[in-house]
Amino acid sequence: AKAAPAYTIAKDIIHLILTLSKVIEADKDVSPYLKVVLVQNYNVTLAEKLIPACDISEQISLASKEASGTGNMKFMLNGAVTLGTMDGANVEIAELVGKDNIYTFGATSDEVIAHYEKCDYNAKKLYETDALIKKCVDFIISDVMLQAGDSHSLNRLYNEIVGKDWFMALLDLRSYIETKEKALTDYDDIFQAHHLIVIYPSPEYNIQNHTHQRNRKYNNQIETVVICFFHII
């Protein structure tokens, strides 16, 4: 993860992750089976190790906020199943592999934009009316978290989510939890998991063919540039 020095809430989120990692590591019943690891200064070198090892790729930007990233494509081409919002390149992947072969959740871009235009998104109302959402958010300032982390940072993040939540995290939270539960259940079904893993690189869906074509075009262009460079020298 990375965050600009002045991006206070982003730093608070990183602190939340580190605190959660500490809490889980201290739990003797949970720690043998679950780890939370924050990968610092994520870059290409780290990606080369992490992407091939990934089982489920979570691409969970708020719909309408992601222009179009390529990270999800790299995970997908290495056999990871995508779980994400209908945002960025997730939309194209869903169209190519079919809705049955990708886990999507959350509001659409049009719905999110409408909330911004009407200024009618109310995080506090969602927090107060949905017990599951309240339970998740309250855990941020639970005793176990406050004892392990910095209370000022955790309380500031809690207040930001309940009082503002500019990126509408609570809007998609329930849908995310339900969709992830389905993904994990399907992963336990080895035959379903293998079906999804095989589907992604399949030429039937044109994804790999498109990628090969792009790679060949890219390599040809680079080769031309290199040849021209040596001719100049």
Q: Which residue stretches match the model-derived regions?
A:
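Intrinsically disordered, low-complexity, charge-rich segments with an acidic bias
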Residues: 205-221
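Hydrophobic residues at beta-strand termini and immediately following loops
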Residues: 39, 105, 200
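Short acidic alpha-helix that forms the nucleotide-activated donor recognition element
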Residues: 45-53
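A short, well-ordered alpha-helix in the C-terminal region of glycosyltransferases
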Residues: 194-203
